[in-house]
Amino acid sequence: MGTVKDQLILNVLKEEQTPHNKITVVGVGAVGMACAISILMKDLADELALVDVIEDKLKGEMMDLQHGSLFLKTPKIVSSKDYAVTANSKLVVITAGARQQEGESRLNLVQRNVNIFKFIIPNIVKYSPNCKLLVVSNPVDILTYVAWKLSGFPKNRVIGSGCNLDSARFRYLMGEKLGIHSSSCHGWILGEHGDSSVPVWSGVNVAGVSLKSLHPALGTDSDSEQWKDVHKQVVESAYEVIKLKGYTSWAIGLSVADLAESIMKNLRRVHPISTMIKGLYGINEDVFLSVPCILGQNGISDVVKVTLTTEEESRLKQSADTLWGIQKELQF
């Protein structure tokens, strides 16, 4: 008598078990796990790998997700602190790093997180040399540059989550103000993910109707409706959430899954994400900033050339200068 399995199943094919749509999430903190569950619930991967340095937490998070397998369509969920577990990933999401404290600027995290990246990036490259890297850790624009430098990857394959979330926050707040669902409220926030981000008021519209054409003072200091406060709220929102609950997680997780979907399904949707923008808007340094990018299976294939006002362009340039000032001091 064979085992129950032998009696039940006749094997007719010896299969090679290589994944075709594998995604890795590095870092299983609040952000990493929000990314993981959001990716799982969008059915984007046939294998999900989790990596972290805290082994008990890592195993616990993996088991907790595995126990939900019946309700998911991702047949393999694995984890290890050994990067061999990440082999053959199509997409690697990096959320590992020091967490922003209450009132702390994202830029303040930089050297701590650079040191962490020096260990992570070479390991990812070793096991998934053809993957796309999606950097989420803050300060995201600088760390995307760091990941690009450390990986040796072409710039199309190194992507920062950038202003995808800032723009989503903006569209939510705009929707609240107008009583319209955020998917029908269009507006782009570009530049640094953080305090010096730039709202492009000229492009803000509903159904193609420019709000600036209806209300020329939109976004200026002389605006009686104070639309500028909408952008101010976007900038302050992360700080407020951190103050209230200690960290942000759900919105960034959903934002990352949105980007992962465009990559894994080769959707070629346009997202405000961090890419190398040297040569645009009079920027001559290797700076990563958010501009609208076409995102698909090869990562960022194209950049949309946005018409900016003189003020918007100078604010973008200022953002770039701030970031370059920090980047050039970094110890690799």
Curated annotation (Swiss-Prot):
Its EC number is 1.1.1.27. NAD(+) binds at residues 29-57, 99, 138. The modification Phosphotyrosine is found at Y239. PROSITE patterns: L_LDH (PS00064). It comes from Monodelphis domestica. It is found in: Cytoplasm. GO terms for molecular function: L-lactate dehydrogenase activity. SUPFAM superfamilies: LDH C-terminal domain-like (SSF56327), NAD(P)-binding Rossmann-fold domains (SSF51735). Belongs to the LDH/MDH superfamily. LDH family. ISGylated. This is L-lactate dehydrogenase A chain. Pathway: Fermentation; pyruvate fermentation to lactate; (S)-lactate from pyruvate: step 1/1.
